[in-house]
Amino acid sequence: MCQHILTHLPGAQGMTQIVTISFFRFGSVRSRLWAFAMMGLARGQMSRVPGVGFWKLFGSGSNEGFTPKPNVSVYAVLATWPDRQTAARSLQQSAIFARYRQQAIENWTVFMKAETARGKWSGQTPFSTTPQNQNGPLAVITRATLRPRKLAQFWRRVPNISQVIGQDPNVVFKIEN
């Protein structure tokens, strides 16, 4: 299991690696089908975005977000950049992000930096960490590859985990249907 702790950086400057998560909400059936298709079709375009390092395309879950039932209206793009200026410029000017914005009824990008990172993602260590011990909002990205023999055990625990997340007063953002 990999866990990555990221700090929200509303005004980050300098040459620190920046991590962005861009969320897109799609309203019509047509735009939702477009977004789903882009999970496969955007790969070639993402690798050509100027300045992008590691990147991943995400779907989202429904209700408390941690369920096997997908939320077909919200998708996200996680990416690393060498600095904030490159991230902002590429997010604004690249054709693929412009297409996502054109299709979406709502979009939001969070700029962050990695505080800690443990494990690999697709065989890579995607985040350069710069521990700052900052007080403020944190984003935690947890991902895992599940072995088939562990699936039943994993999904049995999901309802309790979802309930804990949903009732935690410290959770300031979650994707709703």
Question: For each predicted feature, which ranges?
Answer:
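Metal-dependent nucleotidyltransferase catalytic core
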Residues: 92-98
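Conserved RNP beta-strands of RNA recognition motif
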Residues: 77-79
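Short S/T/G/P-rich N-terminal loop/turn motif that feeds into the first structured element of a domain
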Residues: 2-74, 84-90, 103-177
